[in-house]
Amino acid sequence: MKRIAVLTSGGDAPGMNAAIRAVVRKAISEGMEVYGINRGYAGMVDGDIFPLGSKEVGDKISRGGTFLYSARYPEFAQLEGQLAGIEQLKKHGIEGVVVIGGDGSYHGAMRLTEHGFPAVGIPGTIDNDIAGTDYTIGFDTAVNTAVEAIDKLRDTSSSHGRTFVVEVMGRNAGDIALWAGIASGADQIIVPEEEFDIHKVVSTIKDDFENRGKNHHIIVLAEGVMSGEAFAQQLKEAGDESDLRVTNLGHILRGGSPTARDRVIASWMGAHAVELLKEGKGGLAVGIRNEELVESPILGSAEDGALFSLTDEGNIVVNNPHKARLDYAALNRSLAQ
């Protein structure tokens, strides 16, 4: 394989630029040419394809976002869109594609492989909701951004004796809420993987203020459960009388310079994706398990579902067996600040 392309698709994630950089530099070191595709699959169909060299990726490792831009392009799910994209790849002499993104991006990569264009996926999403890898690119940065924000909210919460509901991204997976909540010492964490009793949530708030000597309360809520405003309304209807505020961290979690960890794993996975394409392998997704590079079928990585579930005792059972087990209940209550 002499010429490959790289694209980013779906929601952006800190560390995508580091992955692109690794793809380009590794490919060049292997004597391959690299082309960039702007705006994901939309750019592929439109022919927005151009050569990439070492100069184009210089100083990109520390930048957030993706300099190749990104877009959601549902039309690529249809055969017509796929064939139009493949026509452009052929026109530019491209023999393989590295796709950086989430589950929707992975489905597009699988379609390319089925049409004879080997594609390798790199998990790039802050939600950490791709199976086959312990961590996705951008997750660590998003968690650190969330923790920094929650720490600051705790300052104002304790100054005024308030309850804060902090909404974070996580449509189908509560990983950001879980990890950021634990790291910030949140009093309660509400995730899609666990059903909650609103009356117990209210009771816990009341217990903190009346019996535990606390003058503030922090609840971290994954957006996949419901919006922060809707959750706050349920709290009030269930009898919460605390001075309640809602903060939605929203898209701020996608921005910022990637952490060292995100830069490193993005570099590892980008280089490994090139190695797979050099061997003519497609339909695979690169991942990190136990700090080692692995690959798995790309479609399975996109469709394995939730990465963890919670037992009645509050224990986190990670569906990916290579992830650590954490005691949700113990960390939530005994270590809460």
Swiss-Prot record:
ADP binds at R21, A22, V23, V24, R25, R154, G185, A186, D187, R212, K214, N215, H216. Its EC number is 2.7.1.11. It is found in: Cytoplasm. Substrate binds at T125, I126, D127, R162, M169, G170, R171, E223, R245, H251, I252, L253, R254. It catalyses: beta-D-fructose 6-phosphate + ATP = beta-D-fructose 1,6-bisphosphate + ADP + H(+). Its cofactor is Mg(2+). This is ATP-dependent 6-phosphofructokinase. It comes from Streptococcus equi subsp. zooepidemicus (strain H70). The gene is pfkA.
